[in-house]
C-alpha cells in the first residue's frame, strides 16, 4: 500500500463537517455530523441537492443537540445513515430509498443498548463512525478514542430480533505516539478498506488536535489487519467510498471533517497502486 497518490478533487460549497459519503451512479451522497440533511452532489453537473432526513432539517446544529450522523452505507437501493450513539441525541437511524425518494426514520437506542450490554462498552465509550451492510451481516466501526480506547469492529447477523454481537479489537498504528482509531470503512470484494485518524483527545464528545490519518486493509474472512499507510499528517479523513477499480489500482473518494461551522467541504481522490 506504499504507492498512493492523494489529490484534491474538488470543493463543494454548502456542506460543512462532512463525515461520510457514498459514490453511486455518478453522484456523491454525503452526510455531515453537524447537519440533518443528506446531500446529493452530481459530479458531471456540479449541482448540489439537499434532502431533509428529519422535519425542520438544519445545516448547522449546536454540538449538544446534533444527531451526529457519522456513518452512511449502501444496502440495495437504500442509503442507511446512522448516528454515532455517543450521546442520547445520537441514536437515530434513517433510510433513504434512492428510487422512491422515501425516508424511514427510527430510534436506534435499543440496538445501541444491546451492543453496550453484550460487549461491555460503557455509554461514554460508544462511538460508531463507520458502517458496512452485506446481505447477511452488519458491521459497525467503533472509534476507540475514549478513555479506555475500545477500538474495533462490532458485527452481527443482520437480524434485528435475534442479534448477538461480536467485537474484534484492533490496535492500529500510532501517529506521534497517539493511536489511530476508525473513522470509516468500505467493503471491496473480501477486503475491508478503512480510514483511521489520530486525534489528541480521550473523549468521544470533545475534539482534539488532529495528527493525521491512515488507510488500511482488513481481511473480511479472518478479521486480521493486512496493511496500512499514513496518507496525511494534517487531515482528519472521515468518509471513504469506492470510485474506480482496475487490475493494478484502486481509487477512492474521501471527505474530511474540519470540525468547523464553515459550509464548504474539500473532496479528495486517493489512488492506491499495486
Region annotations inferred by a language model:
Residues 1-274:
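Sequence/structural signature of beta-propeller domains
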